[in-house]
Amino acid sequence: MKVLIIGANGQIGTQLVDKLKDSKHEPVPMVRKEEDLNTFKEKETEPVLADLEEDISHAFEGVDAVVFTAGSGADTGKDKTEAVDKKGAVKAINEAKSKGIDRFVMVSAFGADFEPKEWPDSMKHYYEAKAAADNHLISSGLNYTILKPGRLTDDSGNGKVDIGERTQERMGEIPREDVATTIREILDRPNTYQASYEMLEGDQPIAQAVERI
């Protein structure tokens, strides 16, 4: 399966490119700066140049699935968050639908589906954007999976997670590497279609956890 990775320059996206290269899937990294093209060409992939805040239609040609890992970050201002996390995501969802690409994986945020009163004031704009994008994907008719990881860390992944509609703990951490591994595992698993999952580090091997959800 040819997989467009939106946000390939991010820490999850970069690791996902490497993991898909070593699988049966073919990653197509989407980058917004020309100087980043060579980085991914050196990885023996065929990157595509596109900016979420501009036209991205060409990036979707010939792909079978889309993974949205882009994000402005919780510390950015409201305008940038709105442009990337909400409008950029909605644009990608609409483009996938128009191109007949029915598999879409969204990396969202733990808590995006909580009641707004539970969101910290300093991050309210971030959660609002994530929630709006998730809801648009849910209503799109695509074969979606929404992953809502807890606090992301740069620790090496241990290959074990707590994943489900609701995790056992109400908040926690997870290495970015384990998020990337989980995306690789769920890409072509129909049992994860039309579903949203919280995910934290846990004690269940990822492949086994994905098979059981």
Regions found by a protein language model. Give the residues of each.
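Conserved Rossmann-fold NAD(P)-dependent oxidoreductase catalytic core, especially the SDR/UDP-sugar
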Residues: 6, 26-30, 34, 76, ...
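NAD(P)H-binding glycine-rich loop region in Rossmannoid oxidoreductase-like domains
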Residues: 29-98, 187-191, 197
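Active-site-lining helix/loop region of Rossmann-like oxidoreductase modules
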Residues: 154-157, 161-213
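Active-site beta-alpha turn of Rossmann-fold NAD(P)-dependent dehydrogenases/reductases
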Residues: 70, 105-108, 150
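Non-catalytic, hydrophobic alpha-helical segments
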Residues: 12, 66, 147, 179-183, ...
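Structural motif
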Residues: 2, 64-65, 103
